[in-house]
């Protein structure tokens, strides 16, 4: 579903529904809006907004998903790519593939992101180890990791804010 059920409201940033919508419609519209906020060329200036968009995109998956937010030298979005899908409590992430995608998109920096289907965004030791492994691999090709964000129903945790980068 696209935004065809929405009409612009009288106030900027508001919308009016022109037909009934389901909860699934609303969630899908929220995901489309979050994706548009992470569209190519947009500068990322507010970390909390970025976390909110990432949470909207990933929090409802029933399996773990690992993704990359690819950025240029001015930290403008090049793209958002879901790279790996796993099980309820893990996903296999291959550093070679992460580096390959970063190079294919000529990314100067990336934000790593994955969800915890349990809803608890607290990073595991495996998450911290993966961050270090990917940081080393990406540094070798001149790509900086700005953050690794873990998403859950209960919120987002930034490994950068925790000093784990």
Where are these regions (language model features)?
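Long amphipathic N-terminal alpha/beta scaffold segment
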Residues: 23-82
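Active-site-proximal loop/helix of nucleotide/amide-processing enzymes and allied scaffolds
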Residues: 2-27, 32, 52, 74, ...
